[in-house]
Curated annotation (Swiss-Prot):
Oligomer and partners: Interacts with XAF1, the interaction increases XAF1 stability and proapoptotic effects, and may regulate IFN signaling.
Keywords: Acetylation, Cytoplasm, Developmental protein, Differentiation, Metal-binding, Nucleus, Spermatogenesis, Transferase, Ubl conjugation, Ubl conjugation pathway, Zinc, Zinc-finger
MF GO annotations: ubiquitin protein ligase activity; zinc ion binding
Biological process per Gene Ontology, one example term: ubiquitin-dependent protein catabolic process
Location within or outside the cell: Cytoplasm; Nucleus
Post-translational modification N6-acetyllysine, affected residues: K104, K114
Zinc finger intervals, C2HC RNF-type: 93-112
Source species taxonomy: Eukaryota, Metazoa, Chordata, Craniata, Vertebrata
Pathway: Protein modification; protein ubiquitination
Domain of life: Eukaryota
Protein name, entry field: E3 ubiquitin-protein ligase RNF114
């Protein structure tokens, strides 16, 4: 029988537990670079896991560092157990609602017209709401802490501050990083903000996003980098 998205912890990777695991059962199968289900997962010496192709990109700088813990980055080894779990764990497509093994879901959503419509409707709804009230260009370089009066953190600084000072805070808060994005909803409150930070904001959006594109181009970008968000 195929496992559901709540199998044992991945090879050497960060493990979700309690409410966080229930809220995001696919989190431990998600690459912190591309934010999609691991493809040919590789575990690096510090214990974190990346898609093989994503790791190759991360290794290109002269002094590469792990994007999760910032330790020195080096080639890793194939995460065999995690790969086995991906082969045997099922999830459903948000578009057609059919079940697929995690190892097959990336290929499926790339060709599923219902999934693409699901993504486009979400992006259009967000951009439509944002266009109703013109706003000045948001500051995407420094952010306030949503828990306390501290402010002027860069993205990495905010992640570290919240991990050190607010790791046990269970209050639902708005993510200031997401709220500054073109598609961001300034009213959406994250149920588990610390876990959200660790999974979604270990890498800067500036690396992947062109903030000046129009709506159609933005939709195409989202489709290409669509996140499987259960």
């Amino acid at each position: 029988m195929a496992a559901q998205a709540q199998a044992p912890a991945r090879d050497g990777g960060a493990q979700l537990a309690g409410p966080a695991a229930e809220a995001d059962p696919l989190g431990r199968f998600t690459c912190p670079v591309c934010l999609e289900v691991y493809e040919k997962p590789v575990q690096v010496p510090c214990g974190h896991v990346f898609c093989s192709a994503c790791l190759q990109e991360c290794l290109k700088p002269k002094k590469p560092v792990c994007g999760v813990c910032r330790s020195a980055l080096a080639p890793g080894v194939r995460a065999v157990e995690l790969e086995r779990q991906i082969e045997s764990t099922e999830t459903s497509c948000h578009g057609c609602r059919k079940n697929f093994f995690l190892s097959k879901i990336r290929a499926h959503v790339a060709t599923c017209s219902k999934y693409q419509n699901y993504i486009m409707e979400g992006v259009k709804a967000t951009t439509k709401d944002a266009s109703r009230q013109p706003r000045s260009v948001p500051n995407r370089y420094t952010f306030p802490c949503p828990y306390c009066p501290e402010k002027n953190f860069d993205q990495e600084g905010l992640v570290e501050h919240c991990k050190l000072s607010h790791s046990t805070d269970t209050k639902s808060v708005v993510c200031p990083i997401c709220a500054s994005m073109p598609w961001g909803d300034p009213n959406y409150r994250s149920a588990n903000f610390i876990e959200h930070l660790q999974r979604r904001h270990q890498f800067s959006y500036d690396t992947f996003v062109d903030y000046d594109v129009d709506e159609e181009d933005m939709i195409n970008q989202v489709l290409q980098r669509s996140i499987i968000d259960q």
